[in-house]
Amino acid sequence: MAKNPNEARVPQSNLVGVVIIAAVLGFISITSLPYIIPGKKVVSYEASLFTFIQTAIENLSILPTTSLLILSGGFVGYLKPENWRLLGFSTIVLFPIASIFEMFLNPTTHNLWPLEFLVYGVLSIPPLIGALLGSKIGVRI
């Protein structure tokens, strides 16, 4: 039997799995919406290596994306309340990784990368709030 009630939910050894879940949920929260919102006119971008990601970022819908990011953060924060900060940031981690990868392969892209990373930082706020709320809910249950 676990000494801490939080340990009974997800063992510490599964932190990597929850980080992967957080990254996938964040990726889906941002990239899927431009393609599934009815009536949304999507402008496609073909210049980058990851055209799917660029098209999704350029056609971002603020309110639905923010809502999904808060829910994603809340879910992973509930699973691992003691690691809510890491999990909140993990929801956005695939986007800077893709940008860095793209910058190495094609150095002429991402000329405004500091601004781009600032946007990723701003996009990490909703899942951080969700992860904090999820961790508080998880501790009480």
Protein language model annotation of sequence segments:
Residues 23-66:
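Hydrophobic transmembrane helix segments
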Residues 99-118, 140:
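Membrane-helix boundary connector in multi-pass membrane proteins
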Residues 6-23:
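N-terminal membrane topogenic signal
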Residues 23-35, 89-103:
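Aromatic-anchored segments of alpha-helical transmembrane domains
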Residues 17-18, 124-141:
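Membrane-water interface at the C-terminal end of transmembrane alpha helices
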Residues 76-89:
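Membrane-helix interface "capping/anchor" motifs
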Residues 68-76:
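Hydrophobic, membrane-inserted alpha-helices
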Residues 54-69, 115-126:
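Alpha-helical transmembrane segments of polytopic membrane proteins
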